[in-house]
Amino acid sequence: MQIMNNGARSAEVVNYQGSGAAKRRRDLAYKVARAAIRKMKREETKMTLYDELVARGLIAQVTDEALIKDLINNGKATFYIGFDPTADSLHVGHFMALCLMKRLQMAGNKPIALIGGGTAMIGDPSGRTDMRKMLTPEQIQHNVDCFKKQMARFIDFSDDKALLVNNADWLLNLNYVELLREVGACFSVNNMLRAECYKQRMEKGLSFLEFNYMIMQSYDFYMLYQKYGCNLQFGGNDQWSNMLGGTELIRRKLDKDASAMTITLLLNSEGKKMGKTASGAVWLDPDKTSPYDFYQYWRNVDDADVLKCIRMLTFLPLEEIDKMDSWEGAQLNKAKEILAYELTKLVHGEEEAKKAEATAKAIFTGGDAANMPTAKLEADSFTDDEIDAINLVFGAGLATTKSEARRTIQQGGVSVDGEKVADIAAKFPKSMFEGDGVVVKKGKKSFVKVSVN
């Protein structure tokens, strides 16, 4: 897609996603053949970093493939990925980007984590059908501080090996007239309105505030190029128009080449974004999603998704992953355990990963689990020293609403201390939850040890 005025050159796009055929489940024979071919090719020639990214299915589309290959394979890329601090924790939706930054840094490239402290005050319309809620500067700063801590698990910021930059440093001090003169003349409104991120908002209404988002993101790339020599931007497919805007702005203003590459979206076999549960997003903050719950999320992925997730998200050698292509049945359960352990170790550390793994095994073999997730009921949760089943399930965090708790009980999906709860009016004495507490179970895979606070 060409974003700029007439005369701007279009990016030479290479698209790795292909048609819907890429989403069809491969049969066993095809998997084995594909793994054999990959093994033969790797033995013939040493795989480059770019080749590995392609083999892992991480690249969706790129501008200048030859230039990007040269940059990242030879450790010459100073690249950035943007993170809008709209929450106080990163989540699984950010996971792919963080892993990519880690891979490229390990190969000698320099990451820039750009925190959108300025753009967060506008809100990105990409992928939205409504306007985002605007945050206060204080809320944004709190979220930025939380991001810094979580990113440090993936990126080495020591000795100038990586940069953490906030675009508020330049966006909040911009003079409007200066911006119009310097940047506005480089953009065509007609071309901007053809961008997918704006098309889907035209019928419901697009504020002028949000309309400026593309210009601001393009300006980010322009500033990062000037200040830090940033020559490559990564982002999601929904950011493609904005990213091309940045490469064209750099070309028009500085007569320099900059590149862009989009990362494959993490979708399940049904084409839906991964990283959501009935309780909401899967967060990287252990206070929002416990290491055990994080482990369980990956342990419970669909059979059709497990090998794709291992290939895209873990740092296991491709040769080792190729051997799993022929796995089926009980072997896929082993693959899920590998996936859950590797990702929990990456996000929460090896100790927490081992605890989560041990807890899961203890629970599913009927043993006791010291590290089982816990919930504390407040004293005012009880009436006449009793609590009903609906409030128990809701208070234990096994349902996001009392209506959901009611439905789960009515469907026979809840047990307390090993006994199935058949009546929504069932009540449990407060004394039952004193001491070590009682295990409350929802379905086959959600367990919480509940006690009185």
For each predicted feature, which ranges?
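Short, Lys/Arg-enriched N-terminal segments with co-localized hydrophobic residues
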Residues: Y30-K46
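Divalent-metal (Mg2+/Mn2+/Ca2+)-assisted nucleotide/phosphate chemistry catalytic cores
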Residues: R56, T136-P137, N143-T262, N268
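A charged helix-plus-loop insertion that forms the helical arch/lid used to bind
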Residues: P125-Q141
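Conserved nucleotide- and phosphate/pyrophosphate-binding catalytic cores
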Residues: I250-N453
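N-terminal catalytic cores of NTP/NDP-binding nucleotidyl/phosphoryl-transfer enzymes
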Residues: V62, L67-P125, Q233-W240
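Short hydrophobic targeting helices and cationic amphipathic motifs
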Residues: Y16-Q17, L28
